[in-house]
């Protein structure tokens, strides 16, 4: 995410009157509270529930190089490391960028790896250039597959990926890590997207557009990945590793241009969350700086044709979508990174849409910059990660 992308997590004050009105309505509707499960994580961006009932959490990293991590959380909030040392570095907007979305299928965990330090801010606001120094990892802007047994998940105290093995993965090798006690994990590169493409601007020809994989979902032998930097969804053939663009989302007019100093005349789409429903893909579009309310949407994508139609409109910084089927009917949980005004100073929300046309019910308004959500149906708990390092639990029985 560059200055007009999801990587920018800047805060700014917003209209007090609008905030009071919106949050009063939210408080009247919200029926759930956020119970902290854990804090102190390294900026968690992705979660997935394993078939052992544990919550797997991707942590994009700290200011330290290669501090990306996958953690295992039990229902009591006890944390163990599954894999540390994943690629992570400070990106072009001075934020850590590393592991992002997770998707678990059987005993294979798919992990999106963000853009890292591939780019740097250009000399003109809103521009990006290639990093003039050496990029710290050859597998930024990629997807990894991590295989591990149920016993390893139950007993491991953690593995660390050596820096040298990042190059081995880039070269197409499968990396096996063992702790000497019979536990091991196997890691392979599923897809390595172009780090960037040329994107010349009339006033700055060297400008580039960065690839920034964010969330992902698998359907049969295809993996679909949102890219918040390139404003598209990738499709990956899991049998061959080949990938192509399924759909690209165009920019829209910025309704706050000339009113809020930040941002240009148009808003990038910034696709974030992705899920499947009725053989279609649902993708949240976060939208770019200054993140105006009402411009964020959930899009419905036909995976056979790439046809894109708006499914839920009028949102604010939608970052995840979760379809829930009950008695042959489907309702939709939408996670908003913030609720009112430009930027992110307002609380995040979980909204429940019985119909795409709304209006939604506010499930929870007790969130601070949430990033993703995972439902444990058996426990009746919705887990939500927050950018500041927390995972919270929200009671939710569909």
Q: What annotation goes with each model-predicted range?
A:
Residues 61, 115-117, 229, 287, ...:
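Residue-level signature of beta-propeller blades and closely related beta-rich strand-turn architectures
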Residues 40-54, 67, 88-108, 140, ...:
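Beta-rich, blade/repeat-based domains predominating
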Residues 56-58, 110-113, 225-226, 282-285, ...:
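Residue position within the beta-strands of beta-propeller blades
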Residues 62-67, 120-140, 228-229, 290-295, ...:
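Short, solvent-exposed loop/turn segments at conserved positions within beta-propeller repeat blades
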Residues 73-78, 147-151, 237-241, 301-306, ...:
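Short loop/turn segments that connect beta-strands within beta-propeller blades
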Residues 35-38, 78-86, 153-194, 244-258, ...:
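Beta-propeller fold detector
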Residues 66-71, 142-144, 232-234, 296-300, ...:
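A short loop-to-beta-strand structural motif that recurs across blades of beta-propeller domains
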Residues 18-29:
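C-terminal segment of classical bacterial N-terminal signal peptides
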């Amino acid at each position: 995410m560059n200055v007009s992308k999801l990587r920018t997590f800047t805060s700014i004050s917003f209209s007090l009157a609008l905030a009071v009105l919106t949050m009063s309505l939210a408080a009247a509707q919200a029926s759930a509270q956020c119970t902290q499960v854990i804090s102190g994580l390294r900026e968690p961006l992705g979660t997935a529930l394993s078939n052992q009932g544990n919550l797997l959490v991707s942590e994009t990293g700290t200011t330290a190089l290669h501090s990306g991590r996958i953690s295992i959380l039990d229902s009591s909030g006890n944390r163990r490391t599954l894999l540390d040392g994943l690629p992570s570095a400070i990106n072009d907007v001075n934020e850590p960028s590393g592991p992002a979305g997770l998707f678990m299928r059987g005993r294979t965990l798919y992990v999106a790896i963000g853009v890292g330090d591939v780019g740097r801010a250009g000399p003109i606001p809103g521009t990006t250039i290639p990093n003039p120094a050496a990029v710290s990892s050859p597998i930024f802007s990629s997807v990894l597959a991590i295989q591990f047994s149920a016993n390893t998940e139950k007993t491991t105290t953690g593995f660390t990926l050596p820096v040298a093995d990042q190059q081995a993965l880039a070269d197409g090798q499968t990396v096996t890590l063992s702790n000497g006690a019979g536990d091991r994990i196997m890691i392979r590169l599923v897809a390595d997207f172009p780090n960037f493409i040329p994107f010349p601007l009339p006033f700055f020809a060297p400008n580039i557009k960065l690839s920034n994989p964010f969330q992902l979902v698998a359907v049969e032998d295809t993996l679909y990945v949102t890219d918040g930097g390139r404003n598209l969804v990738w499709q990956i053939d899991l049998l061959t590793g080949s990938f192509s663009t399924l759909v690209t989302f165009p920019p829209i007019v910025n309704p706050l241009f000339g009113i809020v100093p930040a941002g240009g005349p148009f808003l990038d789409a910034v696709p974030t969350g992705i899920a499947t429903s009725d053989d279609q893909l649902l993708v949240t579009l976060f939208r770019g700086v200054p993140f105006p309310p009402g411009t964020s949407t959930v899009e419905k994508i036909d995976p056979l044709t790439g046809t894109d139609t708006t499914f839920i409109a009028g949102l604010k910084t939608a970052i995840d979508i979760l379809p829930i089927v009950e008695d042959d009917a489907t309702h939709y949980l939408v996670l908003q990174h913030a609720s009112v005004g430009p930027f992110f100073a307002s609380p995040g929300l979980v909204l429940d849409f019985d119909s795409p046309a709304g209006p939604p019910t506010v499930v929870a308004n007790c969130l601070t910059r949430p990033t993703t959500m995972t439902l444990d149906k058996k426990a009746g708990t919705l887990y939500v990660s927050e950018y500041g390092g927390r995972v919270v639990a929200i009671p939710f029985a569909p």
